[in-house]
């Protein structure tokens, strides 16, 4: 009888150990990055997907990001889980905020494996690949995000690379949940290839969705800058700065607009909002060189060096470049005169 009791106890211990091991193996550590999971919580494991997600939400609200990540990933292990694509999107967003781009990429793609039309994951992958320099891949994800949104809106989900025009963009259905970053990001890609009309239609659609979206306002301003429509460029750039005065892209673009309007002193004042005086002086000089005005660039670059001669190596290089261009032009003029 004693032997039977011992056998039962040993069996229970073995079963408990197996259950513990099985539970540990359910946790997909390949999606986790943070403190050792053993140190995160002593609570009983969640019994349902919803409980795990709820725990993750609470942890995220309390800024305990490692615990939130752990709980969200644990929610994926339930066999009948129904929120996997949304949870994986959230996991990807956490990694994105931490600049863990490889894990973010992995989580977003895992989300699409669960639901190919997850708009958020498609949009984020579009941005990730575009920033990585893989613009064609980024573009394809953005277009997929727009199509997924048209499905949600019961519109026409047949948007392709070949049929996007300013006219067709006007027909796309949207609401306040539509993917602003996908519209704006796709618009920027059209701007890069010089198709400013389509670019502006896409970015404006993004602003229809969210009129206060700073990235979209900055992108639209820059699109008009590339078209040399400086009044419109300044209008949208200043609108972005009225919402976020410290936005560096908007400040830089406003400086570029001032330079394009032959206002280098104003550009210097604008650049000085978010950089040191030598950096601002170098910026003005550098962009004047790009505008084909090396002679005007020289005094700004010399001032940058005077302000910080030991540190400002970049200004020296730009000054040498400006002087070389000026000398080359003088030599060319002499040859022509002879």
Regions found by a protein language model. Name each.
Residues 34, 40, 177, 278, ...:
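Terminal, low-structured helical/coil segments at or just beyond the last alpha-helical repeat
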Residues 57, 93, 127, 188, ...:
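Residue-level recognition of tetratricopeptide repeat
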Residues 54, 86-90, 124, 158, ...:
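Canonical tetratricopeptide repeat
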Residues 49, 82-85, 119-120, 153, ...:
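Helix-start (N-cap) detector for alpha-helical repeat units in TPR-like alpha-solenoids
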Residues 65-70, 98-107, 132-144, 149, ...:
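Structural signature of tandem alpha-helical TPR/SEL1-like repeats
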Residues 44, 78-80, 114, 148, ...:
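Structural marker of alpha-solenoid helical repeat scaffolds
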Residues 18-90, 97, 327, 331-338:
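N-terminal leader/linker segments that initiate helical-solenoid repeat arrays
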